Amino acid sequence: MMRDSPSIQGTLDAATQHALLAGRHADPFSVLGPHQAGAHTVVRVLAPGARTVMAVLPGGQRTPLLPMQPGLFENTVPGLQPGAPAAYRLCIEWEGGIQHTADPYAFGPVLDTAQLDHCAAGGWRYLAGLLGAHAASVDGCAGTRFALWAPNARRVAVVGDFNGWDGRRHAMRLRYPAGVWELFLPDVGPGARYKFQVLGADGHTVLKADPLARQAEAPPATASIVPDERPFAWTDEAWMEQRAARQRCDAPISIYEVHAGSWFDDAGAPRWQSLAARLPEYARSLGFTHIELLPVMAHPFGGSWGYQPLGLFAPAAAHGAPADFAHFVDRCHEAGLGVILDWVPAHFPDDAHGLARLDGTPLYEHADPHEGRHPDWNTLIYNYGRREVRAFLIASAIHWLRHYHVDGLRVDAVASMLYRDYSRPAGQWIPNRHGGRENLEAIDFLRELNAAVGVQCPGAITVAEESTAWPGVTAPVANGGLGFDYKWNMGWMHDTLRYMRRDPIHRRHHHHDLSFGMVYAYAERFVLPLSHDEVVHGKGSLLGKMPGERAAQLAQLRLYYAFMWAHPGKKLLFMGGEFGQQGEWNHDAMLQWSLLDDPAHRGLQRLVADLNHVYATLPELHCRDADPSGFAWIVGDDADNSVLAFARVDASHCLVAVCNFTPVPRPGYRFGVPHAGDWRVRVDTGATRYGGAGGGPPICLRSEPIPAHGHPQSLVLDLPGFTALYLRHSE
């Protein structure tokens, strides 16, 4: 054991020594590490709590560094050549043992200057590879490179398991003018927990998680984790090659929306591993084409369901390691399923360890709460006018799509981004530079985002949750649109659910709620969403929205699903809806799988599977989703009987959907059809295989030359109550 070294006065003035030991010195590389002093090289080391420090040359020569003050060591090192950064190592004696390491302050700048300049100009291309924690080898020394954008900070240090969370030990170098602080720490590897200690422009010292961390602790812990950067062994080459064709507007897209934490409880098994073993095969067996996950990004509060994330580059640790999430995506692709993630660039929570006032200023958010705080969620709003913030968000999106092979992003709360007065009364919002309510900076950001995804991630899609009539959400950026591939049809969802909640005796007065959606069905490329938002906050379940006794509720839900699957637009159904979950969704409990012991609920699940199969295999139900020629009303005005009939067509096929939204049978109901000949029943929601009473029409019907509804041919049948029929023309 080495003895404590005698103290010396040293070559640093008292003020500098005090600033170092107090954790206030902003430029550690100017005083720590090797420095030329005349013909000699002086080495200084800041190691509070160390008993002794020695500089060890490659040949084994040892030079004790002498303490100027407890924790601050210095000495001339004979034989050390200036400008040879890796030419010595440190041997540090701590109370608990000996540490051998290279000196972090012996290395020059580690970030590429050209890439830094690109990021400083608002470029996102190199951002995820520059900032955060990355494995690196510098001058033959392995370790981790840390970097943080904090341009207004007075000082930044990286703290963690490797330095006892002592902010004095590893202060970082500022790369001006990019505003990025960097430090290479030798011998720090995957699994190490860390944060950044930031002395802000406001004079306050705070601990911040890494905004670009690719791995994080599970809440309530808040540290970032140095990730394991070994590449994942993907097996989805075939899927990735076919992805673009599977996600086009003329392809069948049926999305199963899932909250990873409550789909199934597998007795404490790691969530992604458990889901990978069960969920892809389940969704595939029901005919879904995609799984959409509520946000999987690291978030501090589970009750937010992920919609208040702080780790925009890290999968939530509660479900497993990043590699486990990659495995889940790979298994989905193996099962022929795409993966869409909900992604939240609209706002972020103000937790102390997060982005809020990261460098002592409103860096990621607006300074004025009329712009920077969201009145609905009490969260902070990104400053889209700042190029570095736009780059941060776009880099996050590209990271999920490229690093994790994700197939699409559903962008949350787009309406709140587009309007400066969203949820704000008069006098509580700031107009744009033209005096209007449009958020011009957010518009530019969304266009830039979608353009970047299109170039960098061919075949990937973006979907907007946009609840207003903003024009051109899915129009190309070049044509003045926002550039999304699809938009949730919130209007269709609200209108039709409002209709279905009504007592059937009153539905005749609200027939337009079912038909109005076709007025604007081709204004955008739409997804019809029955999402998690419709089964929370006292809204009850989808089944619970249907009036009447349980048998009537199930019959109406079957009818509603058949109407939806025949209607133009891609499909989305939240988990539990496929078998008629009775209770409102609870994120703290798994789905009511026991309901599948009931034949009626199994029948509903079977119907969803059959609807998906028919939708995917009959081209007229999907290939002209974005083309008005693919739809024609047959019976759109029979409000008295609450009956709708319409045709879905392509160049060679025709399917007619007939829906009776009352419990009253309609015997001898006649409606026109576009073609003469035989029409086969492809779906009958009242069939016994779906839990219905049966008694529907025969499997094949022949048209009669009796004009009806503008067609020279017609069909006549007994239309049961609460029933939808799909009739396909036989060639």
UniProtKB/Swiss-Prot annotation:
Monomer. Its EC number is 2.4.1.18. PANTHER family: 1,4-ALPHA-GLUCAN-BRANCHING ENZYME. One of its GO terms (biological process) is glycogen biosynthetic process. Pfam families: Alpha-amylase, Alpha-amylase_C, CBM_48, GlgB_N. It is an enzyme of class 2 (transferase). Pathway: Glycan biosynthesis; glycogen biosynthesis. It comes from the Bacteria. The gene is glgB. The keyword Secreted does not apply. The active site is at D412, E465. GO terms for cellular component: cytosol. Keywords: Carbohydrate metabolism, Glycogen biosynthesis, Glycogen metabolism, Glycosyltransferase, Transferase. Belongs to the glycosyl hydrolase 13 family. GlgB subfamily. This is 1,4-alpha-glucan branching enzyme GlgB. It catalyses: Transfers a segment of a (1->4)-alpha-D-glucan chain to a primary hydroxy group in a similar glucan chain. Catalyzes the formation of the alpha-1,6-glucosidic linkages in glycogen by scission of a 1,4-alpha-linked oligosaccharide from growing alpha-1,4-glucan chains and the subsequent attachment of the oligosaccharide to the alpha-1,6 position. One of its GO terms (molecular function) is hydrolase activity, hydrolyzing O-glycosyl compounds.
